Amino acid sequence: MQFFPPLQRATLIQRYKRFLADVITPDGRELTLHCPNTGAMTGCATPGDTVWYSTSENTKRKYPHTWELTETQAGALICVNTLWANRLTKEALENDWLSELSGYSELRSEVKYGAERSRIDFMLQAGFQPDCYIEVKSVTLADHGQGYFPDAITQRGQKHLRELMSVAAEGQRAVILFAVLHSAITRFSPARHIDMKYAQLLTEAQQRGVEILAYKAEISAEGMSLKKLLPITL
């Protein structure tokens, strides 16, 4: 999936109020960007890092520029816009790039399900096969090649795992897909040191039939695609 119009480059001054970031452009202009990431963004928002941002044609937006990528001083590329996790997953599903999830004829998004009134990111259907429920999570937390999720305690994420376990218990196919949006990550694990309950639930979910996948995006300032399967350690 290509960025269009092309992204523009700047240098990060600071991120603040969770949703805002100040940057300076190569020609010396200071801009305030919208930051579409409510997480801790550990390692993704260091002052001095290169930022790649998009610009909306919507003239009514208070902040027309959106922070899309971080290029760290070590050279790693990170997609900080969490909306891309679902966009890339949808593109990969539509093109059968994820072999474990191929062979379905219908793809639906944001389907209501479960006792806790959740919405599943994607549902795959085909003939008389069990429906396939897919929950997508964006992974950007990295430590020496190891990717982790979550980067903060997530009650919502815990709820999604409980819902997926219920889906599996009903005989449907339940999948949690970790979309790794950090070029330096080579393997994935749940972040026990941050949210032990989530890590325990993920292990329990696997034992109860929930499938766990981690796919890494190829990232550049021109575009991204989700194609590479990564090893997982629970």
Curated annotation (Swiss-Prot):
Indicate yes or no for the key word Acetylation. Answer: no
Q: Name one GO molecular function term.
A: DNA binding
Domain of life the protein comes from: Bacteria
What keywords were assigned to this record?
A: DNA-binding
Q: What Pfam families does the record tag this protein with? A: SfsA, SfsA_N
What's the family?
Belongs to the SfsA family.
Check the record and name the PANTHER family matching this protein.
SUGAR FERMENTATION STIMULATION PROTEIN A
Protein name per UniProt: Sugar fermentation stimulation protein A
Which gene underlies this protein? Answer: sfsA
